């Protein structure tokens, strides 16, 4: 028996997914199950620190898939699942954040992987070490800064290695244990460009240890908490009204928040 299931996207909450499967298994214990479709849309321009269903933020798609995939992997009476879809594709009648595009893909329409693609890679590629700073989709950030205090923002890493150490501009932010193939650090942003790097130890088959690394630059626009004539002179300000998402313009790379 197969179902197209979207609990936590078109309605309900994420835990409705496993509840539905359990209910169906109770009714039909001898029937193998397949989830023939599941997925959530994401728009590279939209990011949220409080992601919720149908906001099309990159973060909600990650949250959704980080919930669904373990259920599919760990539920013994589920034979398999098909993520909808692998690639963002044209869909003439859609009128969402990206008109005429179904953006549930793990990769963009030009085949560039979204960050969440590397979550699947970390889960399934147990033959190779995977370490990916999941911020390629959010390299232009902004935040409200009080005085000169750093602005803490999350940076996620996808990995199949047991522990990750994260660095900002060469300074260690410590190590964290991996849970569900993810590690999330609160990173203090304070200037226009930061160099973020991640390192993890990988035990080779011969019991030797190699160091796996990933790195990228993140641009940051601090927005003064108290705007005045002086600090507005060199600041291009955009205001996003009515949304809990950050929005980054394709043309200007200007990032705005509520």
Go through each PLM region and give its residues:
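Extended substrate-binding grooves/exosites of carbohydrate-active enzymes
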Residues: 1-176, 186-189, 194-195, 199-202
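Intrinsically disordered, low-complexity regions of eukaryotic proteins
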Residues: 90, 167, 208, 252-253
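Compositionally biased, intrinsically disordered or flexible polar/acidic segments
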Residues: 220-258
């Amino acid at each position: 028996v197969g179902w197209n299931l979207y609990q936590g996207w078109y309605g309900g909450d994420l835990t409705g997914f496993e509840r539905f499967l359990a209910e169906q298994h109770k009714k039909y214990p001898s029937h193998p199950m397949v989830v023939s479709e599941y997925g959530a849309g994401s728009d590279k321009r939209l990011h949220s620190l409080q992601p919720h269903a149908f906001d099309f933020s990159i973060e909600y798609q990650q949250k959704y898939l980080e919930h669904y995939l373990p259920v599919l992997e760990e539920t013994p009476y589920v034979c398999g699942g098909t993520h909808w879809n692998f690639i963002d594709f044209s869909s003439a009648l859609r009128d969402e954040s990206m008109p005429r595009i179904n953006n549930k893909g793990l990769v963009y329409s030009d085949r560039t992987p979204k960050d969440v693609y590397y979550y699947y890679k970390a889960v399934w590629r147990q033959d190779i070490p995977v370490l990916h700073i999941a911020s390629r989709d959010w390299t232009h950030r902004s935040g409200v800064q009080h005085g000169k205090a750093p602005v803490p923002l999350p940076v996620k890493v996808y990995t199949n290695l047991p522990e990750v150490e994260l660095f900002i501009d060469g300074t260690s932010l410590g190590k964290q244990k991996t849970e569900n193939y993810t590690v999330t650090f609160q990173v203090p942003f304070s200037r226009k460009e930061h160099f973020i790097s991640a390192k993890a130890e990988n035990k080779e088959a011969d019991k030797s240890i190699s160091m796996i690394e990933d790195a990228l630059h993140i641009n940051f626009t601090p927005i003064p908490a108290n705007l005045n004539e002086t600090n507005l002179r060199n600041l291009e300000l955009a205001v996003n009204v009515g949304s809990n998402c950050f929005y980054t313009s394709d043309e200007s790379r200007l990032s705005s928040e509520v």
